[in-house]
Amino acid sequence: MLAGLISAGTAEAGVRNYFSPQFEGARVDACLVAGECGKPAADAFCKLQGYDKALIFQREPLAMCRRIDSGQICSSAVCTAFRQVKCFTTKTDLAALSP
């Protein structure tokens, strides 16, 4: 019975690292809006790339970056962009469920 469960469908994990990730030609801002920085913005970036969520991320100060939600450019001394975002997804092969 266990063999039948295993062959009924497969789940495949997908992981990808994005170094200096960009959105619309600019580095990705580490904030969606004020107060929603870090994980929410990293998750939004990963979802745009077709992944479920961000596993890890690193930030760095940068003179210019773009917010994913609004496309707004931050161009001041206090901008923070992602240096790296590692995205993760689990894909299920539905074709394997057919008899």
Question: Locations of the language-model features?
Answer:
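Sec-dependent N-terminal signal peptides
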Residues: 1-4
